Structures are given as structure tokens and as C-alpha cells.
From Swiss-Prot:
Keywords assigned: Chloroplast, mRNA processing, Plastid, RNA-binding, tRNA processing
Lineage, top ranks: Eukaryota, Viridiplantae, Streptophyta, Embryophyta, Tracheophyta
Protein name as it appears in the record: Maturase K
Localization per Swiss-Prot or TrEMBL: Plastid, Chloroplast
Similarity comment text for this entry: Belongs to the intron maturase 2 family. MatK subfamily.
Native source organism of the sequence: Aesculus pavia
Amino acid sequence: MKEFKIYLELDGSQQHNFLYPLLFREYIYALAHDYGLNKSTISLETVGYDNKSSSLSVKRLITRTYQRLQRIHLSIYANDSNPNHFIGHNNNLYSQILSEGFAVIVEIPFSLRLVSFLEEKAKEKEMAKSHNFQSIHSIFPFFEDNFSHLNYVLDVLIPHPIRPEILVQTFRSWVKDASSLHLLRFFLHEYFNWDSLITPKESISIFLTSNPRFFLFLYNSHGYEYESIFFFLRNQSSHLRSTSSGLLLEQIYFYGKVEDLVEVFANDFQDILWLFKDPIMHYVRYQGKCILASKDTPLLMNKWKYYLVNLWQWHFRVWFQLGRVHINHLYKDYINFLGYLSIGRLNTLVVRSQMLENAFLIDNAMKKFETTLPIIPLIGSLTKARFCNPLGHPISKLTWADSSDSHIIDRFVRICRNLSHYHSGSSKKKSLYRIKYILRVSCFKSLVRKHKSTVRVFLKRLGLEFLEEFLTEEEHVLSVIFPRALFISRRLYKGRVWYLDILCINDLVNHDKFEILSN
């Protein structure tokens, strides 16, 4: 990463082409092909930003990864019986390798910008670097503290895909590198249907599976662009500007939201700022969805709704349907976000009071923000993964029959604990218990079918230790603390628990990718 900084610290006359020379470095492609790095964006603490990192260990990692890739490519070439067939796909192979390396390179300036932003915030507020805000679970306590006094929520599905040329223009406003812009346009030609107004979903799926890092970078750059305009209008229309959520957003998302915007926005949108006078407003985005919560009338929420539709249609040239934006009442409609169903509740508390000889009752309405587990999508995910039928009845996992007993149990336990860990914040644990029951019985049936036995005989042979494998860490700890008072531990376990160590839960939230959990 020291070489990265050398390229980024060039003088003004050379800084316009700081990305292009990195394309000729072999270690860039070694890093791009490393499977550990492909699962997520580059971590700031593991690639050289931390002073404690060893440059020698990084060089060894790059060399080892590069040698492994050479062996993989040689084995593919040796096992291919048709050399012409292999040569015919060289162009696609080279394009794939180049795009993966390019995805690593374009992240560098934004990662350095994020580091400098966090350092400035730490100096201003004299606060230590906290990793708790990186957790996805930190959003829900924020909901509980701030959403209880709000009324309406604007539930938005962010439109995709967008026109490729819009992505190029967005990237052009950040990086003054003509060579990189031409290369980006070339990659978009490869993956997208350039002639159509709306990109087909097949191109998106191919792009996402072939180069997820590059796809996520383009998606986040698109999100940054419209959020910059949105936050600008939000700050200009309110005298009570929010400062508490700035650091939270910066640490959750890899790409920082820069506060300096072009002054032309003020000239273009000055006439419509009076439409959005709302001092209490909260915005949260994750993956392809965002929510906008406010304490105001439905009229104002409708204005925001049509503003967002016009912004995407006219500024980003995206066909946006009104059905992708829903105005929900916080205390009447559920909000499906981050794998939870959230809703506000009004709990009435009756208090008897007496003053002198007169006694009267006072009804206090306590507002509470509840989060529950969506059982139907999870049942559907288990059905797709062949753990149960559409009715939720457990079935055996036939594809794992060739594995050893310990390996089968370990895979079931891992899925069960991951789901319990993430959904521990649910207000009602009955749905979570049902999911755990399906996985436990499916494990029984898979082992029974493998050994051609019955559930009763097989369970008697394994004993109760087999059931303890499915206990979560919380249940183990509570059973140790309260070994004799089991009812106390069960009562404590029924409470909601939010964890601040859950950083990457894409596969847990996205029910269509449930099968990935078992790998």
C-alpha cells in the first residue's frame, strides 16, 4: 500500500493519471483474485493503513496468492482437451482479469478519503476510533431511540439498473483520469446491453456473479451521487442539522459521504427548498433499500416521494415506478429492513393517582419500537435450500449424505447459530424457535437416512450431547451462570440482544442466498 500512496501523492501536474499506472502491476491482480478479499471490500486495517502491519507479511501474501493463481491457470490449460476452445475464450478471460484489477484500483482513492475523514472527525471530537458503529445491529438501537416519536416512514427500493453512461459521468466527477474512464466504459460495454434504455436483469446477474467487487463499487458510487443531492437538500431545508448520525453512516459504508458539494446545486434547487421544512428526519440505506422516517403529515412524505421519483428519472435517466416507494404509518404498517419486520407499538399503562380525597386513573401511552422475525421468507429460504417443504415440515438434506456425521452436524449447527446470533434482537422468539426446530429435525433426518435407521434409535445412540450442539453461546453462558435456576436463564434468554460484532451479514439478510451459509 506504500506504492499506492506514492501514486496518490503526486503533484498536480501528474495526479490526473494516478490510477492508470497501477494497471501494469502484477500484485494488483494477485490481490484481486484472492478469494478472501473478494468476499468484501478491502479492510483498512489489513492492507497497510495501520502502522502495525508488516510490509514483509503483505509481500509474502501477494507472492503466495500469485503463485496459487499460476497453478490454477496451468491446471485449467492442462486439463482442457480442446486448446482452440481455450484460446477462443482468452479475450473474455483477459477482460475478466482486467476488470477485477481495475475494481481494486478504483477503491484506493475512496479508502484514503475515508481514512482522512475519520481522522479529522476524531481530532474534532477528540474521540477514539470505535468499531461498534460498524455493526449492522447498531442500526436497530438507533431506531428504538429515534423512531418512537416519528409517524411516517418512506420505504424505498432503490432503482436498478441505471444507464452505463451515467456511471461513467459519475466517476468522471471524482477522478480526472481519461484512461481509466475509457477503460470503465469498455468494461460496461462488455457487461451491459448498451443499446437498450433499461439494462436487462440478466446482465446485472452476470455482472454481479463475475465481478462482485466492481459491481458493488459502481452501485455505491451511484448511491453516493443521489445521496449527496438528497443530504444537501435536507441540510438546506432545516435549521436543526443532524450531527449524531454522520459518523455512523461513515463507518457503516465503505465510501464516505463528502460534505463539500458543487455550488450549482444551490442555484438549481433553491426554489423548491421551501417544500421540505422538516427538522426531524432520519435516513438509513443498506443494500438496495433505503428508508426515510419523519414526524410530519402525509402531504410532506408525498412531496419527498415525488421528488425522489423525479430525481432518478430526470437526473439519472432511470425509469422509476411509483410502486417502488411506499409511505407506511409507523404504528400501522410493518417495515421490512435488514431481515427484520419492525413496527411501532403503543402500550397503555394505567396509573392510579390520588390527590386529597379524589382518586383518578391516568392512562399513559408508552411508545415502543418492536422488531420481529419474518417467518415466511425464512421458511422459503429453508425450502430452497432443501431443509424443509413449503409447509415448513423438516426433510432430510440429501446432498450432504456423502459427508461424515461430524461434518453434517457441524454444518447444521453453524447455520443454526448464525441465524440465532443475527435474529437475537427479535421481540418474539417463537418464530426463531421454529426455525431452529426445523434445522434440528432436518439434521436428525439427514443422519437417520444416511444410516438407514429411525429417529428414536439414532437419538438414543447419540444421547443428549447431540442436542447440546445446537445450543447458542448465550444459552451455554446462561446455563452456567444459573445451573439450578433454569427458568431464570430461559427468561433472560427471551430478551432482545443486539450484537456489535456483526459486520457482514449479506447472506443472512438476503434470503435468496441462504445456501451460502452452509459453506
